[in-house]
Amino acid sequence: MPAGRKWSYPMYNLTGLELKNPTILAAGVLGTTGASLCRVAREGGAGAVVTKSIGPAPKTGHSNPSMIKLDCGFLNAMGLPNPSYPGFLQELEFAKNNSAVPVIASIFGGAPSEFAEVAEGLLPAKPDALELNVSCPHAEGYGAAVGSNPCLVEAVTAAVKDVVNVPVWVKLTPNVADITCIGNAAESGGADAVVAINTVKGMAIDIESGYPVLGNRSGGLSGKAVKPVAVKCVYDLYTALEIPVIGVGGVSSWEDAVELMMAGAAAVQVGSAVYDRVDIFSEIGAGIEAFLERKGYSDIQKIIGLSHEMV
């Protein structure tokens, strides 16, 4: 939104969190420090922010190059680098004390007990919610290695719910035969919402040398190219689940956000597009608001899942 302009609709409730608008920073490099999270909230206008994924032990991630820009988006294989939950507590506390928006901690582990350990270990910093990363496609033993197994997803979700009293979101991988099976497992485990989608498996090769471009060879594709995948996944999950679906994948404009919301997203996360402009959240919020006014919708809830009424 233009400087000084605020979302004029009522505060937006999502799993009990009060958001100033339905846009959220997706987990990624801008969530690495408390200062960067605050910048996105204050300068960018995000309704909430999600941290970089944090695990049980320090992790350096994959060798460079670990991220490249493509015509259609980004390809990355970061490998979940992080300082561990004890090493991140101070950053999370800073974000909580200075961002003025809900702060969601993204966490990962290789087993239910590790997820529970990290979740419980971050509680002193008082995150507003937790997002379980069971969907990263380029970290062996973590992420999608967990998130492609419905039984394990249910167990991980239940283990975290047992040790926290804040909302738990589960971020799903699109790299499965049927994402609704994974969504149902998360819901059965007690998830308060699911987030769809994480990156799509991808690869790039330097044709002059024949070498894969990424240090890890393959990685995850994000950006505009994955939006149709995200729309379909959100649409299917909205039909299959009773809990909210948070849409993410390829959102770079208010039109993209509205499309995901019509597919069933209760809110939208933005990741890759933030690399071009941090104030994209304000732009998207203003665009959604203008769209609602132009179409005569008195409540943003009127467009959530609207496409399901058209068939």
Curated annotation (Swiss-Prot):
Which InterPro entries is this protein grouped with? Aldolase_TIM, DHO_dehydrogenase, DHOD_1B, Dihydroorotate_DH_1, Dihydroorotate_DH_1_2, Dihydroorotate_DH_cat, Dihydroorotate_DH_CS, Dihydroorotate_DH_I
**GO annotation, biological process:** 'de novo' pyrimidine nucleobase biosynthetic process; 'de novo' UMP biosynthetic process
* Pathway listed: Pyrimidine metabolism; UMP biosynthesis via de novo pathway; orotate from (S)-dihydroorotate (NAD(+) route): step 1/1
Cofactor(s) the record lists:
FMN
Q: Which SUPFAM superfamilies did the record assign?
A: FMN-linked oxidoreductases (SSF51395)
Q: What is the cofactor note?
A: Binds 1 FMN per subunit.
Provide a GO CC annotation, any one: cytoplasm
**Places the protein is found:** Cytoplasm
At which positions is substrate bound?
52, 76-80, 133, 198-199
Q: Which UniProt keywords apply?
A: Cytoplasm, Flavoprotein, FMN, NAD, Oxidoreductase, Pyrimidine biosynthesis
Q: What reactions does this protein catalyze?
A: (S)-dihydroorotate + NAD(+) = orotate + NADH + H(+)
Q: Does the keyword rRNA processing apply?
A: no
Active-site positions, per UniProt? 136 (nucleophile)
Residues binding FMN are 52-53, 133, 171, 197, 223, 249-250, 271-272
What is an example of a GO molecular function annotated in this UniProt entry? dihydroorotate dehydrogenase activity
Q: What is its main location?
A: cytoplasm
> Which Enzyme Commission number(s) are on file for it?
1.3.1.14
| Key word Oxidoreductase present | yes
Q: Which family does it belong to?
A: Belongs to the dihydroorotate dehydrogenase family. Type 1 subfamily.
What this chain does, per the entry, is described as: Catalyzes the conversion of dihydroorotate to orotate with NAD(+) as electron acceptor.
User: How does this protein assemble?
Assistant: Heterotetramer of 2 PyrK and 2 PyrD type B subunits.
Protein name in the entry: Dihydroorotate dehydrogenase B (NAD(+)), catalytic subunit
What is the organism of origin for this protein? Methanosarcina acetivorans (strain ATCC 35395 / DSM 2834 / JCM 12185 / C2A)
